[in-house]
Amino acid sequence: MAAAYKLTYFNITALGEPVRFILSYGNIDFEDNRITYDDNWPSVKPTLPLPYGQMPIFEHDGKIAHQSLAICRFAAKQAKLVGSNDWENLEIDAAADTINDLRMKIGQYHYEKDPEVKEQKKGPLFEETLPFYIEKFEKQIEKNNGYFAVGKLTWADLYFASLLEYLNFMLGKDLTDGAPGLRGINEKVRAIPQIKAYLDKRPQTPC
């Protein structure tokens, strides 16, 4: 019997990994359709049902969804990683969106093609942006009993832990160095049996 859900993304962690973590946590069967990014990609891309030309995409019962955070929110509901009321979900969504804000700022530095411009971006990122976010995150985690929101494990925690390898790859350093709250979340998430089982079987990729 075919899996009820199909996730299509590149064969890396990045924006596909949060969905994989959340579905794995919920023991939700899904097809992990990994696309190799190589010289064949330009010919492969037109064959994929990409609503806006980007991945990941998520398929279910003949329907197709895009946008990684929207997919995460849907998957989190299925996996019961959401809050108990609308306000709690607002706090969880805000935490995940803020993590994504940081991801985009790191990406703007990492993917800069002009070496001189990239060097100009390095100082502000490492000396201002990262310390600002890490300090805020640490206070937030302390306030929420070791989690990002509502004092318990939610999809925001899985979102961070699943992105960490990719963030570290782009930075060339461990984002959790000197940040015990962030490190603790990563360790707790990776110790979850369902997540550990997924990590043990997933393909080895550069990031």
PLM segments and residue spans:
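Generic preference for well-ordered alpha-helical elements
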Residues: G16, N89, I134, A179-L182, ...
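Alpha-helical recognition domains of nuclear gene-regulatory proteins
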Residues: I22, F74, K136, Q140, ...
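Hydrophobic alpha-helical bundle segments that form small-molecule/ligand-binding pockets
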Residues: E138-A149
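Short, solvent-exposed turn/loop segments enriched in Gly/Ser/Thr/Pro and often Arg
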Residues: F10, W155, R202
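C-terminal helix/juxtamembrane-tail motif
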Residues: M1-Y5, R183, K188-C207
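Short acidic/histidine-centered micro-motifs embedded in hydrophobic/aromatic stretches
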Residues: A95-T98, Y109, A161, K201-T205
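GST superfamily/GST-like fold recognition
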Residues: I92, F148-K173, D177, G181-I185, ...
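GST-like domain detector, emphasizing the conserved glutathione-binding G-site
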Residues: M1-P124, E128-F132, K143, K152, ...
